């Protein structure tokens, strides 16, 4: 997934750069080839219901082989029992065997998309009005295409990095309950992805409503997604003889209590750095509230100001929300069972059981059980913020967008970093792609990303990986 933060009003518009690089300003640097790669990825359906990640991986592997990569350095992997959920491993060997590799990581699976709901065909890459439209254009086939394109460009140039540059394209990031490719690699192919650190999705650059750049974010920590099942069982009976002890009533009251509960504010290195940095950029009441919360997380007035912004609210705490309901077995019978799924995004380092225990207290009804139906991935371990990571990001960002600050961030959602960080591979969300305040339809209808953002992100990530590879 990608960050869905938004900005409710213009922020220091006069002081920040407007998107100015033209669509074709950087000349012919293989852009047509990159666009063909991007198009092929978007137009390869990789939804769980009808798609094929293995096919997408095979197509990207073919591009690398065509660029001259030997079979030993390009491999499509297919986990047993999951023929359409395969992925790609590739590498450009480095010159120093003592230097640990860097890993370019991307998932190629996408959220479901129904043609009848979309204005355009979701599985056709369409350029219109300065945007690329299509499922996965933003989340995250643009970056996946950049990673493949990077390896092609490096090979074409004869670039010999000090560190080995590895690529992993995976499936399953968007499909809860199915196989996760990054998690599978961490468990079954750990050596193949071993790296000093990895770069993947997570957060983008922020634009305000007028298209002014606000900041380039770097993901250093993220929450863990965990579902909890609220369930009530009851003997039921005939609907003509209602009783107060109704499974649906118990469940509705429980869900209502959850909806009104706020978990306490927490700060870690990532969101502390974010609010400290953004307080100077945002200014005004919001900026003052950010600074106040950093100084005192218990400042209720400051927290109330930040909570008006959905993204800031989510960055400050664990959040839980009802996502599905199911109850009853017949329209003329008292319900024998009622269930609700509560999806929680758990603040880094907080145990799952601690959240379950708190939900039990909030529900405060012995008739309602609170269970963990499935554990998907370990608890997030934040990647350390170091000069070796942030320095090159700042250098390249200032080359492309002078004056735009680089700000560490905590992602309210979750990415495949949740599998690599606990496996000992610090993983950072760095895209170099600036996105609109409304999120660009990620996971929703008519997903889009600015054409300019894709091409600028391509340039940014190309330069950044080169710097990292020669550290």
Residue ranges and their predicted role:
Residues 1-11:
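Bacterial N-terminal signal peptides that target proteins for export
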Residues 9-20:
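Bacterial N-terminal signal peptides
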Residues 26-135, 154-163, 342:
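Acidic/His- and Gly-rich active-site-bordering loop/insert found
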Residues 35-46, 231-234, 371-378:
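Acidic/histidine-rich, surface-exposed loop or edge segments in extracytoplasmic proteins
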Residues 42-51, 132-137, 216, 237-242, ...:
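Second-shell loop/turn segments in exported
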Residues 91, 97-99, 111, 206-207, ...:
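An extended, acidic, His-containing surface patch that forms the Zn2+-binding/catalytic region
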Residues 131-132, 138-217:
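Acidic/histidine-rich catalytic neighborhood of metal-dependent amide-processing enzymes
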Residues 183-187, 240-264:
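A short core secondary-structure module
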């Amino acid at each position: 997934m990608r960050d869905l933060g938004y900005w409710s009003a213009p922020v220091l518009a006069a002081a920040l750069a407007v998107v100015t690089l033209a669509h074709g300003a950087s000349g012919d640097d293989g852009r047509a080839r990159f666009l063909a790669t991007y198009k092929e990825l978007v137009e390869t359906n990789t939804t769980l219901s009808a798609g094929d990640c293995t096919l997408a991986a095979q197509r990207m592997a073919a591009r690398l082989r065509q660029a001259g990569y030997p079979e030993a350095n390009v491999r499509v992997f297919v986990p047993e029992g999951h023929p359409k959920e395969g992925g790609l491993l590739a590498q450009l060997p480095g010159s120093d065997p003592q230097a640990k590799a860097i890993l370019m990581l991307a998932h190629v699976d996408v959220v479901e998309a129904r043609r009848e709901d979309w204005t355009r065909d979701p599985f056709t890459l369409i350029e219109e009005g300065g945007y690329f439209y299509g499922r996965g254009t933003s989340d995250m086939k643009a970056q996946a295409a950049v990673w493949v394109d990077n390896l092609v460009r490096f090979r074409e140039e004869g670039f010999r990095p000090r560190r080995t540059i590895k690529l992993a394209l995976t499936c399953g990031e968007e499909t809860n309950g199915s196989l996760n490719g990054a998690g599978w690699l961490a468990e079954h192919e750990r050596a193949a992805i071993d790296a000093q650190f990895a770069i993947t999705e997570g957060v983008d650059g922020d634009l305000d409503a007028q298209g002014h750049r606000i900041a380039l974010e770097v993901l250093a920590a993220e929450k863990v997604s965990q579902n909890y099942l609220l369930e009530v069982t009851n003997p039921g009976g005939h609907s003509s003889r209602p009783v107060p002890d109704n499974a649906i009533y118990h469940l509705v009251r429980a869900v209502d209590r959850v909806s009104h509960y706020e978990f306490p504010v927490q700060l870690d290195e990532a969101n502390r750095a974010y609010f400290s940095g953004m307080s100077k950029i945002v200014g005004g009441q919001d900026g003052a509230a950010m600074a106040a919360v950093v100084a005192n997380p218990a400042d209720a007035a400051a927290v109330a100001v930040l909570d008006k912004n959905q993204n800031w609210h989510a960055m400050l705490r664990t959040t839980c929300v009802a996502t599905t309901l199911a109850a009853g077995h017949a329209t003329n019978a008292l319900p024998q069972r009622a269930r609700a799924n509560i999806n929680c995004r758990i603040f880094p380092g907080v145990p799952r059981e601690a959240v379950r225990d708190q939900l039990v207290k909030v529900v405060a009804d012995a008739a309602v059980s609170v269970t963990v139906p499935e554990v998907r991935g370990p608890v997030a371990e934040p990647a350390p913020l170091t000069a070796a990571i942030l320095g090159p990001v700042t250098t390249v960002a200032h080359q492309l967008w002078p004056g735009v600050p680089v700000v560490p961030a905590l992602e309210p959602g979750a990415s495949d970093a949740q599998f690599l960080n606990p496996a000992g591979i610090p993983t950072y969300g760095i895209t170099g792609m600036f996105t609109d305040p409304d999120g660009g339809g990620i996971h929703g209808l008519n997903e889009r990303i600015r054409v300019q953002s894709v091409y600028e992100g391509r340039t940014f990530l190309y330069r950044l990986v080169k710097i990292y590879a020669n550290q």
